[in-house]
Structure formats: C-alpha cells, structure tokens
C-alpha cells in the first residue's frame, strides 16, 4: 500500500512538473541558473532568474558594508557584485526582447567596473574616484558635488537600492504568477485566455514615469 502511494505521489510530481515546464515555470532553488541567457525563451523564467540575481546583489551590497572585512575580502566581494550587475543587465535585455518590462530604463547611465560600499575606501580606489569625478566635472562643465552629497543614484545603482522599485518588481512577479495560475487580475480585469496586452508605448511611459518619481524622491 505504501509503495503504491509513493508511486502515485511520484507520478503526480512528474505531472505537476510537466505542467510547470509547459507554463514556463521552474524551481529556481533546485535548478542551476543558465549562463546562456539569450537561450531562455520563457518570459516568466527570465523574470525569475533576474529576481534571483537581484536578491544576490542585495545580499552582497549589504555585506560589503561590513567593517570587519579585510581589503582582500572587499576586493573579491566587489568583483562578485560587478559580475552580478553585468548578468543582471543581460537579463534586462533578454526580458525586454521577450516583450517584458524595460527594466534597463530604471538604471543609471554608468557602465563598466564600479566600486560599492567599503570597497570605495580601498587604498588607491578613493583617490582614483576623486580624480575621475574631477575629470568628469571638467568635461561636462557641471559644478563639483562634495562626496557627502553623493548617493546611489550618482553611482548608477538607484534601480537596486530604491525600496519603491523593489516593490514594483515584486508586484510584477506576483502578477506573472497570477496570470500563469489563471487567477483574475482585479486591476486589469483580464484572465488567462482573454488577455489585453498594453501598447508598448504605454508600458514604456509608465516605467519612465515611475523611474522619474523614484529618482526625484531620492534627490529631494
């Protein structure tokens, strides 16, 4: 009797897994995150993987503030954050190509290797950053901003540090799960099988407006 129950449970698990795969869902906790990002053709999966990357970034950005870390540990951790930021950007592009939100519109314009948290205090790094800021000021003609007034927006990290934006992404993830489960969306009034897709321009306008509001809130 016990063996029959185990067999039935196994069959049910396989059936549920097949349904999840067909719907584009997967258990990210048990699956290795793909390195070939452009090969992920399911929007829900891409959003799930991006969410996992965002959580890793958040944990490491918090950890890099730890005053107990050595210079060696800070450099290693900063390298890891930069790699995750690069991966996050590739997921942004893939999600956009699959018809999802344009997350890249929330990001800063800075590209390349960046320093976070206490890594900015490493020997040689602080001097280099000060020199870069002075060069940028001369090129742009803008006034110099004292270090005490700098924030995460300046360093191109506002999209991952703004609480409101994180809530927006959580809401987006919840909406996707409801759509795949066939749960009606009270705000939009649609269910799976009768989906009204917003115009691309409307979605971009909404995301741009959200970005402006969040950045302005930080600067006020």
Curated annotation (Swiss-Prot):
Subcellular location: Cytoplasm; Nucleus
Gene: ISY1
UniProt GO BP: generation of catalytic spliceosome for second transesterification step; mRNA 3'-splice site recognition; mRNA cis splicing, via spliceosome
Name of the protein described by the UniProt record: Pre-mRNA-splicing factor ISY1
SUPFAM superfamilies in the record: ISY1 domain-like (SSF140102)
Species of provenance: Yarrowia lipolytica (strain CLIB 122 / E 150) (Yeast)
Location, primary (coarse class): cytoplasm
GO molecular function: first spliceosomal transesterification activity
Keywords: Cytoplasm, mRNA processing, mRNA splicing, Nucleus, Spliceosome
Stored InterPro entries: Helix_hairpin_bin_sf, Isy1, Isy1_sf
Main function: Involved in pre-mRNA splicing.
GO CC, alphabetical: catalytic step 2 spliceosome; cytoplasm; post-mRNA release spliceosomal complex; post-spliceosomal complex; Prp19 complex; U2-type catalytic step 1 spliceosome; U2-type catalytic step 2 spliceosome; U2-type post-mRNA release spliceosomal complex
Short name of any one Pfam family annotated for the protein: Isy1
Known partners and oligomeric status: Associated with the spliceosome.
UniProt family annotation: Belongs to the ISY1 family.
């Amino acid at each position: 009797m016990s063996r029959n129950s185990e067999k039935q449970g196994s069959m049910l698990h396989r059936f549920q897994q097949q349904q999840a795969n067909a719907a584009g869902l997967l258990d990210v906790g048990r699956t290795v995150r793909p390195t070939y990002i452009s090969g992920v053709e399911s929007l829900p999966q891409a959003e799930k993987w991006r969410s996992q990357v965002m959580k890793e970034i958040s944990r490491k950005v918090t950890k890099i503030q730890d005053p107990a870390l050595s210079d060696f540990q800070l450099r290693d951790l900063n390298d890891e954050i930069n790699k995750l930021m690069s991966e996050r950007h590739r997921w942004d592009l893939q999600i956009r190509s699959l018809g999802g939100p344009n997350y890249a519109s929330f990001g800063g314009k800075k590209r390349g290797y960046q320093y976070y948290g206490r890594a900015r205090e490493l020997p040689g790094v602080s001097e280099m950053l000060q020199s870069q800021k002075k060069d940028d000021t001369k090129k742009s003609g803008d006034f110099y901003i004292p270090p005490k007034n700098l924030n995460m927006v300046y360093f191109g990290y506002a999209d991952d540090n703004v609480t409101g934006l994180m809530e927006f992404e959580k809401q987006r993830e919840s909406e996707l799960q409801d759509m795949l489960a066939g749960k009606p969306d009270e705000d939009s009034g649609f269910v799976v099988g009768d989906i009204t897709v917003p115009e691309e321009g409307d979605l971009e306008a909404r995301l741009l407006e959200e970005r402006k509001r969040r950045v302005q809130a930080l600067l006020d």
